[in-house]
Amino acid sequence: MSKSLQAIRGMNDILPEQTPLWRYFEGTVARLLDNYGYKQIRMPIVEFTELFKRSIGEVTDIVEKEMYTFEDRNGDSLTLRPEGTAACVRAVLEHGITGGGQVQKLWYIGPMFRHERPQKGRYRQFHQIGCEVFNLDGPDIDAELIVLTWRLWGELGIRDAVKLELNSLGTAEARARYRDALVEFLSARMDKLDEDSQRRLKTNPLRVLDTKNPDTQAVLVDAPKLADYLDEESRVHFEGLKARLDAAGIPYVINPKLVRGLDYYSKTVFEWVTDKLGAQGTVCAGGRYDGLVEQMGGKPTSGVGFAMGIERLVLLLETLEQVPEEISRQVDVYLCAFGEAAELAALALSERVRDQLPNLRLQINAGAGSFKSQFKKADKSGALYALILGDDELAQQVVGFKPLRGQGEQQSIAWDALAAHLATCVVQG
């Protein structure tokens, strides 16, 4: 196949054998968010470039090196969204849904785009589920977001594989004081910093704390600590969050180097990390951004949220073998029909069954075929049971019912009793 007809590097097709697990994960998260009172919002995947420069920060790696930006026919600079928070804030501002102090608890799902080096768990098109809450400024809502994700990990069976890391960045004023102290400390040791950290020191000093370079990490051991520069408001907020997590029985560790890669965060920041996926260990991250709405032209409005990477969490489910058996099976019952009259009856019969069992995954054989070939298809489909409809069954208005997995003899079931029988065997099963 020529290169022009291949997917773009780092942008992957999600094939039919993969989508059931994606749908299971997405459905589990959506149900949980609904139960917690969050409402879905859908934003465009393309925004004006200025939105991300104003929100994420012009000197961040995302804006400087990773965004997919282009000029449209009107001469406007547009960007494929690299993250969801800025677009969500733009939407609530544009439509005025947080005006007058209205509390909004929102969630979204969709693709994001960053021009990074593709590797396992990191792609140029990736998918996120995000939550954003506006006009609640206490630590209780920060705690709720974390408790919600903790419950999700439990439902997915991955709770033992993830760890919660917490930090507080303080207010913008506290962070500015700390930034000055950090720059002074590191500038005196510039020759000991790696090249990337030297660049970050000039553009976004707090990101030096993110470094993976062992020499720079050694320098940071004696660096000023952000916690020593927190204002009283931020200290009280952070202590309130920790108290709520302690009360809920959620374990966490304080990571003083956790700063996040986006400029808009303040006070609470958190990450859920795992050591099961190699270098790409962050599966969910978020925090508070109380100044972002005002920064983007709105009135002072508190905000807090998180985003989780679907690719990484699906990969974690597969790695830990936490894929429910029914998810990998896409068919419950396979109906084999032999002869033209049986094929006609099969379609009508299957629709009657679907009327009574709307959640039954029933597949009818298509393309005719011999008894042997149809049973081979039935087995390959992963179905639990095969239904057999031929001339003899048609004459008696019955179907053959044959278990395909495990023990059980074939038996005849009257058409009128078929739905009830399937409900017992499959739906209640």
Curated annotation (Swiss-Prot):
Q: Which Pfam families is this protein grouped with?
A: HGTP_anticodon (PF03129), tRNA-synt_His (PF13393)
Q: CDD domains, alphabetically?
A: HisRS-like_core, HisRS_anticodon
Where in the cell?
A: Cytoplasm
Q: Give one GO term, molecular function aspect.
A: ATP binding
Task: Quote the cellular component terms of the Gene Ontology held in the record.
Answer: cytoplasm
Q: What does the similarity note say? A: Belongs to the class-II aminoacyl-tRNA synthetase family.
Q: What is this protein called?
A: Histidine--tRNA ligase
| Gene it is expressed from | hisS
